[in-house]
């Protein structure tokens, strides 16, 4: 069966939309026409997209719409309908229609969310707790604040990378233009020097010849490198690029601990059980890091205190462990995670400010070395030629 999202008009002239499974598009249209819908538009939802996890921006938009409508007193079914109307992404519209059908069939919102892999498990679990306690709008607000905070940190990281990437790309483009069009002009002047040419000059001359005579090899190599970079980006995200800038590694670690502590804070303050909160917080981290902190959850399951569990993993600093110990002794673990998150946020601000001050001079130094190397390779042979006369 194929999946379709459709929009149409009923016999009363009211705009309607929904999700439909059918063997073909024509069968789907006949089905909808038979149910009294006209002016139909249908979009096929690829089966592979059903396994796609929504990114942070999409989750934030969904939570914003739902929280705003529920806070205004709109019923949940109507809120999902309004959210579908405001959506531009057909895949997300399809999911919302499916969720609305699940609600009409008697499922809770949390059960409907947990049926689809597109939504983070954190959202489904917190909404499940909120439904049992009657605090759905409040918990949606907490989730919205958490994901908006994540989105703001991600945007700050991207802005930090934009400047060096743009400048470096322009430098590479200008360098390639110089090698392809300017270097051949110098080659005709240096043709009589032979082995006396400066080694860097010979490298540039050979590179220029290769780019002009065999461009297809370089184009193929560029496409392969682009595909590899795209694969790395889809696997690791953009954050791996932070390793290329000063302080990038520390920044990534600080961001991970910040998201982890904030996630634990909102889950514990909502009423999620500690073991479940630890499992859900692990999923916010990269796969390799999850394996390193997995002993924390296993130690808590075996009966150890949270302080003892965290002290077993070197990733967590002594200050982190100390704050957790204070939270356990006072019975306010969520407050301890909140203080840890605040400290991590302050640390992140300092790291980003330090990185901002270093990026420009480091980039200028690298470009200066590149320009110096080009000038030396092109003009040193001129001095050797002048010595002959």
Range-by-range predicted roles:
Residues 2-10:
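A short beta-strand micro-motif
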Residues 15-21:
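A short, exposed loop/beta-hairpin motif centered on an aromatic-Gly-Thr core
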Residues 33-67, 239-252, 256:
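Membrane-interfacial amphipathic helices
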Residues 57-156, 249-355:
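Glycine- and small-hydrophobic-enriched helix-loop-helix hairpins
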Residues 152-203, 211-233, 346-389:
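Bilayer-spanning, highly hydrophobic alpha-helical transmembrane segments
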Residues 195-205, 243-261:
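Membrane-cytosol interface motif
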């Amino acid at each position: 069966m194929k999946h379709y999202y459709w929009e149409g008009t009923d016999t009363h002239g009211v705009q309607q939309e929904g999700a439909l499974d059918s063997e073909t598009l024509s069968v789907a249209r006949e089905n909808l026409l038979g149910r009294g819908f006209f002016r139909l538009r249908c979009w096929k939802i690829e089966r592979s997209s059903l396994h796609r996890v929504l990114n942070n921006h999409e989750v934030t938009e969904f939570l914003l719409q739902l929280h705003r409508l529920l806070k205004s007193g709109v019923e949940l079914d109507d809120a999902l309908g309004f959210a579908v109307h405001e959506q531009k992404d057909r895949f997300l519209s399809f999911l919302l229609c499916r969720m609305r059908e699940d609600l009409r069939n008697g499922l809770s919102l949390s059960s409907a969310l947990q049926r689809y892999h597109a939504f983070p498990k954190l959202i489904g679990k917190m909404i499940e707790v909120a439904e049992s306690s009657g605090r759905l709008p409040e918990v949606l607000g907490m989730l919205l604040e958490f994901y908006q905070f994540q989105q703001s940190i991600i945007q700050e990281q991207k802005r930090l990378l934009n400047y060096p990437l743009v400048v470096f790309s322009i430098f590479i483009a200008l360098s390639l233009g110089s090698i392809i069009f300017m270097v051949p002009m110098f080659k005709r002047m240096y043709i009589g020097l032979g082995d006396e040419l400066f080694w860097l000059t010979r490298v540039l001359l050979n590179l220029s010849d290769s780019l002009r005579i065999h461009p297809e090899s370089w184009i193929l190599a560029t496409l392969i490198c682009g595909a590899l970079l795209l694969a790395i980006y889809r696997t690791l995200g953009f954050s791996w690029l932070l390793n290329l800038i000063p302080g990038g590694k520390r920044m990534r670690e600080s961001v991970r601990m910040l998201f982890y502590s904030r996630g634990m804070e909102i889950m514990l303050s909502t009423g999620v059980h500690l073991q479940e909160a630890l499992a859900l917080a692990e999923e916010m981290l990269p796969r390799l890091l999850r394996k390193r902190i997995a002993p924390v959850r296993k130690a808590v399951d075996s009966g150890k205190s949270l302080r003892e569990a965290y002290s077993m993993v070197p990733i967590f600093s002594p200050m982190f462990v100390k704050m957790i110990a204070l939270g356990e002794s006072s019975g306010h673990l969520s407050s301890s995670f909140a203080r840890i998150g605040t400290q991590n946020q302050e640390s992140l601000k300092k790291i980003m400010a330090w990185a901002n001050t270093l990026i420009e001079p480091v980039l200028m130094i690298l470009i200066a070395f590149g320009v110096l190397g080009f000038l030396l390779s092109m003009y040193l042979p001129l001095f050797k030629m002048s010595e002959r006369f």
